[in-house]
Amino acid sequence: MSFPVTDVLEAGRIYRSIGKIPTDLLRAEIYRAWERSHLQGANPYALQAEKLSGLDTERLVESSTYLINAARPYFRILSQAVGRESHAVMLSNHHAVLLDVFGDEETIHRTEGFPVPGTLMSEAVAGANGIGTPLAEESYTEIVAAEHFIEGFHPFSCQGTPLRNEQGEIVGVLSISARSPDVRQRLKEILICAAHGIEAEFLVANLEKDVR
């Protein structure tokens, strides 16, 4: 079920005015995400998310090579599926910290405040978004434009899905952000299939390690 853009914008206006989240103007999963964001102190007026230091980001990326290496072959596939729309494919760890970003030059390098590796995307920091919310919901989630909790993410529509290891534990999130909300329906199944492919890569890597 989707809600008109005007309803979502009105929900945001009401929240910023009186601190109340209207239950009748938001999808159920978005209401839950906003409530979590509010309770954890996310700032709805933020124009961008906080980041780790350069050194901490470098260390995190180095310690997450297994996840990045498994996901990267699927980045270009997802990017091609989006087509000419402005977009970015993003990968995070299980703490919602971005590890890698792939997409068109305009979106990634020329959009002020666009998330980069080391960006903190948990709902506590960045509010409802295509990384932190799938992690909190433990399932595929879409965040369309103004459904994002912080204003800086409103130009984008995002969808994300958790990545799980052999034990079923969430180890990261795979997400796509696009400026056009119209592409999300055709990308949903592709994103989920890519996530399954990455999870299969985890299994293959572990089997190869056992053989050695």
Task: Label every PLM stretch briefly.
Residues 78-79, 131-132, 147, 160:
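A generic local secondary-structure boundary/capping motif
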Residues 94, 145-147, 161, 179:
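Fold-independent oxyanion-binding glycine-rich loops
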Residues 122, 126-129:
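A gly/proline- and charged-residue-enriched helix-loop-helix capping module
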Residues 129-141:
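Soluble sensory domains of the PAS superfamily and closely related sensory modules
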Residues 141-153:
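Membrane-proximal, non-catalytic sensory/regulatory domains of signal-transducing membrane proteins
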